[in-house]
């Protein structure tokens, strides 16, 4: 699979060529809202260079509100409809590599272990993912501390590197090679490959924290005092979960309108008090301390035990957006540092 170059002034032609064969999904700004991953429409100008803050690909693969079943009892008989996403080939562009890796975490939840979510699977099965490494790394990233990021490339179909006036297009699968074969792409020169490698090394070294990857799931402690410290600051707004590209907690709700009942899936978070409230009234997590502990131990220990992947990809959104400045990097440094393990 040969690496390619795409000049930025050829991107509109590249997108048009993609749109002729695929439904193209990319971050789009509409109005004053942050860029969201949407299926491109005529007149859209997608942000595919990773230069701006954006919502996550999760919002496309696992919508914030999705009707799963409709039941209508009009006329005395019940009709049942299960609205499914369209079955069509898609290409996703403009996802930061940490966000693209987060799709792998979602895959473990919704496609593995003998359970397949048909709604998620329909969007995912014909989706080619093209990740992006931007020209400048975000200050909040800490990807290199979490995993062997070298392996992340194998989990996407191609990686685009922003080299200023052009993108370096590196296919990593047969799907990616098919995209690279589009006529707008040219063969990469050795100097371009060197520039790409420099950018890749910058990405891998961004936000390195003082602990080894294994420490994430070996050094977390149930009784660590840090959980109470987090809980004292946390206001349980749920932002860290809702903006996380890999958090997948959801709730099921029924809504009645006349003779029609819709059952839909919507966002939820383990940081809300009623998340673990049971039907008979018992709640095993009545304070914020166990809820704060659950979220981090689930992401960094339990998901690794269950699926073999860490449930965080270091995208830094929770660092940037937490209203009370709980910095997960500081928490991990305190709980997982190799110095602590050796003491």
Question: Can you say where each PLM-predicted feature lies in the sequence?
Answer:
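Short alpha-helical basic/polar micro-motif
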Residues: 96, 238, 242, 320
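A short Gly-Trp-Pro
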Residues: 18, 22, 55-63, 67-77, ...
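Ferredoxin-type iron-sulfur electron-transfer modules in oxidoreductases and energy-metabolism complexes
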Residues: 211-232, 250-343
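Short, flexible loop segments at the rims of nucleotide/cofactor-binding pockets, characterized by
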Residues: 2-4, 219-220
């Amino acid at each position: 699979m040969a690496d390619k170059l795409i000049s930025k002034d050829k991107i509109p032609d590249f997108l048009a060529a993609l749109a002729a064969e695929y439904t193209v999904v990319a971050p789009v700004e509409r109005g004053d809202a942050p860029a969201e991953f949407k299926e491109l429409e005529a007149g859209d100008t997608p942000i595919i260079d990773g230069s701006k803050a954006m919502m996550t690909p999760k919002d496309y693969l696992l919508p914030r509100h999705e009707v799963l079943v409709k039941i209508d009892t009009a006329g005395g008989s019940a009709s049942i409809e299960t609205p499914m996403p369209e079955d069509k080939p898609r290409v996703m562009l403009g996802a930061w590599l940490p966000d693209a890796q987060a799709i792998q975490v979602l895959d473990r939840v919704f496609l593995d272990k003998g359970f397949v979510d048909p709604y998620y699977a329909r969007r995912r099965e014909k989706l080619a993912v093209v990740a992006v490494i931007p020209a400048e790394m975000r200050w909040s990233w800490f990807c290199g501390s979490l995993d062997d990021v070298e392996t992340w490339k194998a989990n996407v179909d191609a990686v685009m590197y922003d080299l200023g006036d052009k993108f370096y297009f590196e296919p990593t699968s047969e799907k990616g090679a098919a995209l690279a074969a589009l006529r707008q792409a040219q063969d990469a020169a050795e100097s371009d490959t060197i520039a790409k490698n420099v950018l890749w090394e910058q990405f891998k070294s961004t936000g390195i924290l003082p602990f080894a990857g294994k420490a994430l799931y070996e050094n977390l402690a149930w009784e660590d005092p840090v959980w109470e410290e987090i809980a004292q600051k946390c206001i349980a707004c749920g932002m860290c979960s809702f903006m996380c590209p890999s958090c997948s907690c959801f709730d099921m709700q029924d809504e009645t309108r006349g003779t029609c009942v819709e059952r839909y899936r919507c966002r939820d978070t383990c940081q809300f008090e009623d998340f673990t409230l049971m039907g008979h009234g018992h709640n095993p997590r009545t304070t914020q301390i166990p809820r704060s502990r659950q979220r981090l131990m689930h992401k960094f220990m339990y998901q690794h035990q269950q699926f073999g992947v860490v449930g965080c990809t270091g995208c830094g959104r929770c660092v940037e957006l937490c209203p009370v400045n709980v910095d997960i990097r500081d928490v991990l440094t305190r709980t997982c540092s190799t110095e602590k393990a050796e003491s």
